[in-house]
From Swiss-Prot:
Keywords: Carbohydrate metabolism, Fucose metabolism, Glycoprotein, Glycosyltransferase, Membrane, Signal-anchor, Transferase, Transmembrane, Transmembrane helix. It is a single-pass type II membrane protein. This is O-fucosyltransferase 9. GO terms for molecular function: glycosyltransferase activity. CDD domains: O-FucT_plant (cd11299). It is found in: Membrane.
Amino acid sequence: MHGLSRLGNGSSNGRINIPSPSPPSSPRIRHTRGKSLAGGVYKQGLGERLVFLLFSIVFRRKGVLLLAPLLYIAGMLLFMGSFGFTVLDLGHGVEIVYRRGSPGSVYRSPKVFKRLWPVMEADVNGSSHNVLMEAWKPRVKSVWKPCISTNVSAAGSNSNGYFIIEANGGLNQQRLSICDAVAVAGLLNATLVIPIFHLNSVWRDSSKFGDIFDEDFFIYALSKNVNVVKELPKDVLERYNYNISSIVNLRLKAWSSPAYYLQKVLPQLLRLGAVRVAPFSNRLAHAVPAHIQGLRCLANFEALRFAEPIRLLAEKMVDRMVTKSVESGGKYVSVHLRFEMDMVAFSCCEYDFGQAEKLEMDMARERGWKGKFRRRGRVIRPGANRIDGKCPLTPLEVGMMLRGMGFNNSTLVYVAAGNIYKADKYMAPLRQMFPLLQTKDTLATPEELAPFKGHSSRLAALDYTVCLHSEVFVSTQGGNFPHFLIGHRRYLYKGHAETIKPDKRKLVQLLDKPSIRWDYFKKQMQDMLRHNDAKGVELRKPAASLYTFPMPDCMCKEPDPEPETDPA
């Protein structure tokens, strides 16, 4: 073994701070005095003018500065009252803050839907076929195409040792760990051992790597660039008494730079012959040299394909969606609907405002996050979360948005989701708007799904494949699933994500207006669709992930030999 790495002469960056892929904590309320959506201008009330007058007196007359604390408290009380806040003390230092009457702060979408439904039902102008065919405007002159081979170097002849990682989380968190591990193994000129999957307490899926991904194809696809083995050789295992846990587990910083790996990990690898990182999640910086980025591209977009049982059923499901959507040229819409109980609970948003819902959500938060939401000083702001676009969209809101964009009741819609919170109640309006709606449970037979039951990652792989091949993909909330899927769609569809990411701040404002006109709502939704089309092709920024933005690291811009023409 030798100490050569594959960093080359490329410079490396230090640690990069980027937003966490998991859902953020509740945001602070943003007090603004700008124009509202309806164009109204905020005016100062009598209470606020009194507060400012008192403060001006204090700062002009130094003799009354001792009264400042009392005046401050009195002013804050007036301020809170004038802005319409209600504070509910839950005890143990936890408070829920409501801001009464703020546009968009309350879930009023069912009232809007009930009033608009007769108009929506009667609106047959245009056809869903045309919307599906014309949702994405033709690209002209040039397109983005995969060009991974130009950025990837060959594997070294002599390995520096064995690199072992443990991947945790759900399907796409594991995918992230695998692809980054390939890049690190290439950087260190190490042999990668097929990653070990950790049994996650949330996902509860005991699947191994080979149950989800095609092991043999993974090894073959990487063979020219990174050495991969299914398990450690017998002589190495003997040194550690056949116990992988005895191998040194390195604790690495999040978002570590290539230089960090060469300075801290490579010497240990050369000395010991094998190193382990458990867990290995978000342990490599986004900005690395081009040939290391190329390994990420190769692993994610080419080497990782699902295991044959998943692949075969997923292909059948896609074929069935295409057959059912024959009237629209085999095109369909897929929606990643994040309205499971854990997502609703974590968001700290409210929907029916009943005591039963509150108790249910409190219990769900305690089960999943053990006191995180009961810490002293924690302030929960459901209204502010909704105004700020942090609340998961309900099935009803997704349906209204799509109908407003022009997708009518003949549109075939596939919903990718886990167990929807109160599914009978919340899914009914979406089915009413889109009666041809499909899920994996309606698209596949119980016998076909039986081997996948109890394995959330394998079920997610079925959803991933059906969404990947849809004409339009709708992402309703953040997370690793849409992040990877959007990047994969860009890789397949000439750089365009062909994805709708709703402007939820705008949407909650519109759905807070019971008197809103259907034609006005439609115009706003169609503007939103055009905006998503315009943002479909985006290059990766320094602090962004190539798994979502594969250009320019994994794709090259080329002239389009067959430019698409506008049917008009």
